[in-house]
Amino acid sequence: MKLKNYNLKSKIALVLALACFTSSAFGEESGLFLGLGFGAHGAKQNIRSTKLLDENGLKIRAMQSATDFGGAYYFGYKHIFDEHSGLRVYLNSESNNVEVEKSNGESAIRSYNIFGLGVDYLFNINPNFGLFVGINSAAISWDKEIWSLDWENDEQEYRGYVAAQMGLRGIFGEKKRHAVELFGKIPFTKTTFKYQMAGVTVVEMDLKQTYNVGLRYIYTFAMD
């Protein structure tokens, strides 16, 4: 009789435990969030002469690639629809280092910056693990010493930037306010600079971020 009573109590305790787990299993909440990211990126420079120089025997073709590290900040709002899906919209500010060779032969670290708007769809496989996919539309600005022939006088330029992004999310904490993400970005756009003589373009330079991968930490603020 005592054994049966013990089994009954065990079953009740198990049911209560499962109920508590279920109520908090998908506890990720909507709210404002801040994020910090760090990762590696690739950049490519492609220089080519135009038809005018090519036809006069002055053909120029040069391509260089570089890899380095950078950091990013994020601020936005996340809305959770149900236990498996959500959407977030945020502002991002990124700075990526590039090593350049100056005219005197010395190397220096310069950067290009990205300021924009990101939109991600969130899909949770379970309470602690999920995926995301989205797009980042932004403005990109390359340091003048990366592209300018007269960097002391040329003005800083901002151009369009669009990239697809995707990754994995680990969600943790009592109220699921913390997340660590492994992300990857695939840029679609490039920045083209044109160099002219007597009003005629003679050389063009393309600069492009080729990829960006890394880790993010995201903290969501309570809305209650």
Please identify what each model-predicted range represents.
Residues E28-L34, H79, E83-L87, P127-L131, ...:
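Outer-envelope beta-barrel architecture signal
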Residues L34-F38, L87-L91, L117, L131-I135, ...:
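Membrane-embedded beta-strand positions of outer-membrane beta-barrel proteins
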Residues Q45-N56, E99-A108, D143-D154, T192-T201:
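Outer-membrane beta-barrel translocator domains and adjoining extracellular loop/strand segments
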Residues G42, S65-I146:
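Gram-negative (and chloroplast) outer-membrane scaffold detector with strong preference
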Residues M1-E29, M223-D224:
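Cleavable N-terminal export/targeting peptides
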Residues S30, M63-G71, S107-F115, Q156-A164, ...:
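Residues that define the transmembrane beta-barrel architecture of outer-membrane proteins
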Residues F26-K78, N212, I218-A222:
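Short glycine/proline- and aromatic-enriched beta-strand/turn motifs that initiate or cap beta-hairpins
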Residues I47-S49, E94, V98, E157-D224:
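Predominantly the C-terminal beta-signal and adjacent terminal strand-loop region
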